[in-house]
């Protein structure tokens, strides 16, 4: 994700490099602040333990994997997936591309939530306990080591067999030895691909956005730097997008959120509640579009939305971050609905969450515009 300025949260100084940050920090949850803003009666979607991405740029993978995990927990199926395995497969793939491009490509772990679906469909998945992310690893340094290794292979015209062998030695030393080729779960044996398909099929999730420079209720490749695979997002009017988010969360489904965290409210949240400045209201489709076109809304970070609550007349969404439990309220932060309206780049959710009301025909992935309806016409009925 894109590099941002130093962000102050309470007394903590967090330095972002994309969606990562330096490890040295203190979390405001240590003082207990913020819990007054999370009503006791609120139902939070069950999740796996909060993880810490360190200074890596893998927030997109953390956020999307967390969403997949929570979706399964909702259905009574506990699953905890390995980030390190995805990072290793991604780096190996990029190394091959870099070699054949003779160094005219870059090696980076930046990405978007839909990319995670592509990677687990292609390479499979591993349980978290089988290939746990080592806490000491610096993925930015590892990317530079991979590039240096590839440059050497290019200069020697070594071929990909030798390059793969050297890469595996590097990854084994830096990340850890790969687990067995088979995944063992509940007495059954799977290949990594079979295991991945048991937790997520490619068509199981839909990605949504809302920008007026493309037709509504059609798919388009979102113009953000990290959309490296040119994934297509379903474009909805802003009110419809927000309705999908709210109804999904209220029905117990997690939502993967991608958006901008450069707002002043995010830099200094009051008791972990992040709002936008008053002069930004009301947030309309036009004001949101202006922020995006003037490059003030950028694709900075990915989190998982796991709950919602009202504070006075303002709705907030509870987001699970990937900066460890010592950040925010035990790893959680609350974004106002206005913040989401203005600063959301895109969201991803299961198709089941997207089709929250099966009595109504909604826009389904890759349907034609004539099959779609205006959700605002049923807004007061749900």
Residue ranges and their predicted role:
Residues 43, 165-382:
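Active-site signature of cysteine proteases
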Residues 54-68, 107-114, 301:
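Active-site nucleophilic cysteine motif
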Residues 24-45:
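N-terminal regions that are enriched for targeting/export leaders
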């Amino acid at each position: 994700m894109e590099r941002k300025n130093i962000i102050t949260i309470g007394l903590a100084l967090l330095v972002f490099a994309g969606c990562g940050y330096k490890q040295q920090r203190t979390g405001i949850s240590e003082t207990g602040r913020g819990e007054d803003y999370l009503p006791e009666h609120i139902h939070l979607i069950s999740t796996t333990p909060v993880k810490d991405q360190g200074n890596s740029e893998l927030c997109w993978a953390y956020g999307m994997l967390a969403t997949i995990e929570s979706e399964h927990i909702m259905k009574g199926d506990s699953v905890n997936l390995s980030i390190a395995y995805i990072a290793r497969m991604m780096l190996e793939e990029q190394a091959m591309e870099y070699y054949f491009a003779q160094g005219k490509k870059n090696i980076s772990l930046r990405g978007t939530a839909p990319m995670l679906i592509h990677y687990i469909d292609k390479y499979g998945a591993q349980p978290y306990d089988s290939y746990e992310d080592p806490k000491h690893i610096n993925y930015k340094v590892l990317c530079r080591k991979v590039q240096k290794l590839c440059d050497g292979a290019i200069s020697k015209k070594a071929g990909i067999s030798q390059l793969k062998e050297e890469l595996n030695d590097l990854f084994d030393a830096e990340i850890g030895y790969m687990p067995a080729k088979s995944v063992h779960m509940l007495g059954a044996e799977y290949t990594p691909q079979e295991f991945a398909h048991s937790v997520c099929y490619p068509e199981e999730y839909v990605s949504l956005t809302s920008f007026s420079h493309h037709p509504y209720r059609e798919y388009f490749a979102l113009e953000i730097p990290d959309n490296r695979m040119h994934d297509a997002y379903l474009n909805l009017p802003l009110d419809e997008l927000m309705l999908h988010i709210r109804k999904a969360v209220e029905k117990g489904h997690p939502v993967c959120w991608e958006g901008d965290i450069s707002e002043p409210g995010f830099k200094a949240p009051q008791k972990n509640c992040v709002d936008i400045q008053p002069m930004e209201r009301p947030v309309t489709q036009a004001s949101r579009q202006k922020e995006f076109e003037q490059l003030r809304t950028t694709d900075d970070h990915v989190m998982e939305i796991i709950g919602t609550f009202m504070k006075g007349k303002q709705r907030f969404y509870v987001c699970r971050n990937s900066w460890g439990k010592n950040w925010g309220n035990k790893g959680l932060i609350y974004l106002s609905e206005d913040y989401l309206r203005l600063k959301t780049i895109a969201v991803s959710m299961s198709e089941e969450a997207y089709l929250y009301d099966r009595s109504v025909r909604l826009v389904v992935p890759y349907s034609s515009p004539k099959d779609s309806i205006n959700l605002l016409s049923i807004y007061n009925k749900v």
